[in-house]
A protein has these predicted regions:
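Short, acidic, metal-binding catalytic loop of nucleotide-sugar glycosyltransferases
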Residues: 16-25, 272-287
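Conserved donor NDP-sugar-binding/catalytic core segment of glycosyltransferases
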Residues: 91-123, 348-393
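A recurrent flexible, glycine/aromatic-enriched loop bordering the glycosyltransferase active site
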Residues: 64, 72, 123-147, 151, ...
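Glycine-rich, basic loop-to-helix element that forms the pyrophosphate-binding segment
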Residues: 57-74, 319-336
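Short aromatic/hydrophobic "clamp" motif used to bind/position activated sugar donors
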Residues: 79, 341
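Donor nucleotide-sugar recognition loop
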Residues: 157-173, 208, 349, 415-465, ...
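C-terminal, non-catalytic tails of nucleotide-sugar-dependent glycosyltransferases
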Residues: 142, 206-248, 379, 391-418, ...
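A conserved acidic beta->alpha catalytic loop
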Residues: 31-40, 59, 293-303, 349
């Protein structure tokens, strides 16, 4: 625990919260040359306990040097990071110790947390997602309590002075790059004190920390061999990874359609034509083919216009069977030339010119099975923030919330792992689709994307929702939106749902997908 000029009551409470723990521990305190007599008094009293060791720096060195001093002195197999004015829950170390005993190969562990004010009132519980490496790149979500295998913390170089202010984020990025197992304890075991001027109370309180975090993420990308640039997100302490995709990579876009028209923003449009127009006009990735799988009722003038727009980049595939969205997607995949596939509903419109780069590039990274985008309704509200499966609900995170809503703990602003993705905009590879057997044709209209997502996740692959990649989805203007009970029962009988979604445990509004 690094200490510097801590208010007496807060320091005493922090130390007491450790001393009351029932598990075996040592508390290593490093005082960074505090001048306060109260700090010296509290530490002198604390070190009377044989479980407490206090080191005193002669010269103030800052949080990174102080933390490294503490790490160098640690005797335990694991180190837990505690700020000098925060609190551990009474059962904290006992729960941590039990978890470490259950999984001997744990190298990094984190818990849920809340905030506590000067009056001792607890609020703002952060029920965190399970291990989400993409979210960690975009947000230091694991926070407190973080428990790291001591040997690994030292092996990666400890705390980096270049990351002053975001040194924990930098360290956790380095540790998790090598960790054999990362475990989340879904229990509030840490209380983050919110005082004026602290990041707990105001995320913009330390702008230098945001910049340090941005640089830490960039170094992480370089170590991981991820071709891209870390940029600032929409709010302080959020980041975006802008990935690079080799222009030579061919992408096949598969669009099932019946060729209908609909009113959008007061004007009637041919939906599939305007989607293709937006792709060809806006996409900055040019090596594409567009496979349109159409039913016989599709008007000939629509087919003619698609051919005129796309020329050799358009492939029209006739589908003569009864309506089956899943079958049409599978037919489109078989007709496509590329290894990398992007499935789009015909009632979409591109907003982000780099949508193909940002959806396809992650598929080259180990363990990524599919990606999806941020989808908006015509009125700008959020339509898709990833799938959430919990307690019998099959939902879209953030469905219908304002488009500028940051979501619970900024979940709608940062890219992250999720339990599933809508097939309205889903990127994957031919290899993955063949591995899982494609779309389930027993589900012709609804929940086929839920089934596909569960199959992909069942192969141990991750699904990423890419927050900075946006398209409009004029949902169901081209088909009957009705959900049949038998469809729901089919997918529930096959897969069920957990009680709590591992990637989105709180803050969603239950709505059928």
């Amino acid at each position: 625990m690094p200490v510097y000029e801590t208010p007496e009551a807060a320091l005493r409470s922090a130390i007491d919260s450790v001393l009351c723990q029932r598990a075996s521990f040592e508390l290593v305190v490093v005082d960074d040359a505090s001048t306060s007599p109260a700090v010296r008094e509290v530490l002198a009293e604390a070190e009377k306990d044989p479980r407490v060791r206090v080191l005193r720096r002669a010269i103030n060195g800052g949080i990174v040097k102080t933390s490294n001093d503490a790490l160098a002195e640690a005797n335990g197999e694991f180190v837990a990071l505690l700020d000098h004015d925060d609190l551990l829950a009474p059962e904290c170390l006992e729960v941590v110790e039990r978890t470490l005993g259950t999984y001997p190969d744990i190298d990094y562990l984190y818990t849920d947390e809340d905030k506590v004010d000067d009056a001792g009132q607890h609020y703002d519980v952060f029920a965190k997602p399970d291990w989400s490496p993409e979210r960690l790149r975009c947000q230091m979500y694991t926070g407190h309590l973080s428990v790291i295998r001591t040997s690994l913390a030292r092996a990666v170089g400890g705390f980096d002075e270049r990351a002053e202010g975001s040194q924990d984020h930098d360290l956790v990025l380095k540790v998790t790059e090598r960790a054999r197992r990362v475990v989340h304890i879904p229990q509030v075991l840490y209380h983050w004190r919110a005082i004026p001027g602290s990041v707990a109370m105001d995320q913009a309180a330390k702008p230098y920390a945001h910049d340090a975090g941005l640089a830490a993420v960039q170094r992480h990308l370089e170590r991981m061999g991820i071709r891209g640039v870390a940029t600032s997100g929409e709010l302080p302490h959020t980041y975006r990874v802008v990935r690079h995709l080799d222009p030579s990579v061919q992408v096949s876009i598969v669009i099932p359609t019946r060729g209908p028209s609909a009113l959008v923003w007061g004007e009637r449009r041919s939906m599939v034509v305007e989607l293709v127009r937006s792709v060809l006009r806006l996409s900055t990735h040019r090596n594409i083919e567009i496979v349109v799988v159409y039913d016989p009722p599709t008007p000939q003038d629509v087919l003619d216009e698609l051919t005129r727009l796309g020329g050799e980049q358009i492939r029209l595939v006739r589908f003569d069977e009864p309506f089956n969205f899943s079958a049409k997607c599978n037919v489109g995949m078989l007709a496509a030339s590329a290894e990398h596939l992007v499935f789009l509903n015909d009632d979409m419109e591109v907003v982000s010119p780099d949508f193909l780069e940002q959806l396809v590039a992650p598929l080259f990274e180990e363990g990524v099975g599919a990606t999806g985008a941020r989808l908006l309704f015509a009125d700008g509200s959020l339509q898709h923030g990833g799938h959430v499966y919990a307690s019998g609900d099959l939902t879209h995170a953030g469905f219908g919330t304002p488009g500028d809503d940051e979501g619970p703990f900024r979940a709608y602003l940062v890219s992250r792992e999720c339990s599933g993705l809508t097939a309205a905009c889903l990127a994957t590879t031919r290899q993955v689709m063949e591995q899982v057997g494609g779309f389930c044709e027993d589900l012709p209209s609804n929940f086929n994307d839920v089934d596909l997502s569960r199959k992909i996740r069942g192969e141990g692959l991750r699904m990423l929702w890419i927050a900075g990649t946006t398209l409009y989805h004029f949902e169901s203007v081209t088909r009957d939106p009705k959900v049949h009970e038998w469809e729901y029962e089919y997918v529930m009988d096959r897969w069920g749902t957990p009680k709590v979604d591992p990637y989105f445990p709180v803050g969603y509004r239950p709505v059928f997908v």
